[in-house]
Curated annotation (Swiss-Prot):
Domain of life: Bacteria
Catalytic activity: [protein]-peptidylproline (omega=180) = [protein]-peptidylproline (omega=0)
Organism of provenance: Synechococcus sp. (strain WH7803)
Name of the protein in question: Trigger factor
Name of the gene this protein is made from: tig
Protein family membership: Belongs to the FKBP-type PPIase family. Tig subfamily.
GO biological process: 'de novo' cotranslational protein folding; cell division; chaperone-mediated protein folding; protein transport; protein unfolding
InterPro entries per UniProt: PPIase_dom_sf, PPIase_FKBP_dom, Trig_fac, Trigger_fac_C, Trigger_fac_C_sf, Trigger_fac_ribosome-bd_bac, Trigger_fac_ribosome-bd_sf, Trigger_fact/SurA_dom_sf
Length: 481
């Protein structure tokens, strides 16, 4: 029976869903039943009969009429759904769902009689924008901070420092203490899991250990022992330790410090590809200025995209949301794996459920941003020229010449997505108004993270400008705004 003979009626449902009602003619329901009997006859093993030679009456008696009808109906539903999609050119997302139960449909199914099958499926959303031009947004401008040049130089000096033993004085801030310690909870005296070590190097810097630990070691002499009272922060990774008071019995076994290299041309050559300290300073300054501009541009784009999303009208299908949630969870798992963590043991079913639940708002926001840009491209007829795409592809492939396991089609799509997004965001900047807003007050957590961030920036001093090829490889699945 050809798909053209089916009568198909579609009805839109909320949440970007579509109800598809298919009128199945009597001859097709009969054909499905006959095919089911033939299939079962070929697969069933009955004593005294060869496969495919079981008489119909015996087959029905042995298997039961209900099982044969159910087998026929399953096949019929699958085939009419496939034909209806092709006939109506419906782009379904995921698997369809019967309107009602299979058992209810089975009760109405009589081979040789017409049947109506109604199914629902998610379909691709149809995003529209109420407005595209004249949008208004506020964005923070990131200013170049000259003091960060000195911070980066200091961090680089620390990385290139020579560690030497300390003699004749007590531990000071910035030293490296070799300590043995044993931690117990103050409330019940139980040992802290992972809270003991026979010998461990500890940088005596604020934020390296839980509050109170480093401060307790400062002032100790080699060979000293003392008990230090600490309190685990409320955001400590181990939930059962959060906010609990603890005592650490500490022994200072050895003490070392760093001898920093002189800040001169020799240091510049060792720390970077520059020949002089002046050149290194100039290079770091330019990097910081470029970074400030990139961050400012990113802030403008984020603000404009948020303004565009406010103009978006769309219903997100649940299947798309769930797929994006899974993508986010997989990204999290990948990040943990790169850090050497055992993802299989860490990602328990409960943790995965919690991650999926907490990731849903971000997943929905990412979908809205993506669909808003899609709608903008369609509304303003913006696209990427083949010449621009091919030129960028040639550039990226040249940078990836030594890389393996790169899917050419995925790479092409990633480059196309990046170029289109760049074009769309540029168009938004030209056709919208972005005003500068005052920087938000810096939180204590952000302040505490500054040394680590400065260290990360300083580590780049010895490396040439980050390769765009690596970015293209890392983003080979999709362009992220």
């Amino acid at each position: 029976m050809s798909a053209a003979s089916l009568k198909v009626t579609t009805t839109s449902r909320p949440g970007s869903r579509l109800a598809v009602e298919v009128a199945v003619p009597a001859e097709r329901s009969q054909a499905s039943y006959e095919e089911a009997i033939t299939r079962l006859s070929r697969s069933v093993n009955l004593p005294g009969f060869r496969k495919g030679k079981v008489p119909r009456t015996v087959l029905v008696q042995q298997l039961g009429a209900l099982r044969i009808r159910a087998t026929a109906l399953e096949s019929l539903v699958e085939s009419v759904w496939r034909d209806a999609l092709a006939q109506e050119t419906i782009e379904a997302l995921g698997q369809p769902e019967l309107s009602g139960s299979f058992e209810e449909l089975l009760d109405t199914f009589k081979p040789g009689e017409a049947l109506t099958v109604t199914m629902e499926t998610d379909v691709a959303p149809s995003p529209t924008l109420k407005s595209t031009k004249g949008l208004k947004a506020e964005a923070e401008t990131v200013a170049f901070d000259a003091a960060k040049v000195d911070e980066m130089l200091e961090q680089s000096r620390r990385q290139l420092a020579t560690v030497v033993p300390v003699e004749g004085r007590k531990a000071e801030q910035g030293d490296i203490a070799v300590v043995g310690f044993k931690g117990t909870y103050s409330d019940d005296g139980s040992e802290i899991e992972g809270g003991s070590a026979d010998s461990m190097d500890v940088d005596l810097e604020h934020g390296r250990m839980i509050p109170g630990f480093v401060e307790g070691v400062v002032g100790m002499a080699v060979g000293d022992s003392k008990t230090v009272d600490c309190t685990f922060p409320e955001d400590y990774p181990k939930e059962d330790a959060r906010g609990r008071k603890a005592s650490f019995a500490i022994e200072l076994k050895d003490l070392k410090t760093r001898e920093l290299p002189e800040l001169d041309d020799a240091f510049a050559k060792q720390a970077s590809e520059q020949e002089t300290l002046a050149e290194l300073r100039s290079d770091l300054e330019q990097r910081l200025k470029d970074d400030a501009e990139r961050r400012s541009r990113s802030n403008r784009h984020d603000a404009l995209l948020a303004a565009l999303v406010e103009q978006l009208e769309v219903e997100l299908p649940e299947s798309l949301i769930q797929q994006e949630v899974r993508n986010l969870v997989e990204q999290t798992a990948g990040q943990f794996a790169q850090q050497g963590m055992d993802v299989q043991s860490l990602f328990t079913p409960e943790l995965v459920r919690n991650l999926m639940e907490s990731s849903r708002p971000e997943a929905e926001e990412r979908l809205r941003r993506s669909l808003a840009l899609t709608a903008l491209a369609e509304s303003e007829k913006l696209s990427v020229d083949d010449a621009d795409l091919n030129a960028k592809l040639k550039e990226v492939k040249g940078q990836l010449s030594g890389e393996r396991d790169i899917d050419p089609e995925r790479l092409r799509q990633a480059v196309l997505d990046d170029l289109l997004q760049e074009k769309l965001l540029g168009w938004l900047e030209e056709n919208s108004t972005v005003t500068e807003k005052a920087p938000e007050a810096e939180s204590d957590a952000a302040k505490a993270s500054k040394p680590a961030a400065a260290k990360k920036d300083a580590s780049k001093a010895k490396t040439a400008k980050t390769s765009k090829a690596k970015t293209a490889k890392a983003e080979s699945e999709s362009a992220e705004s």
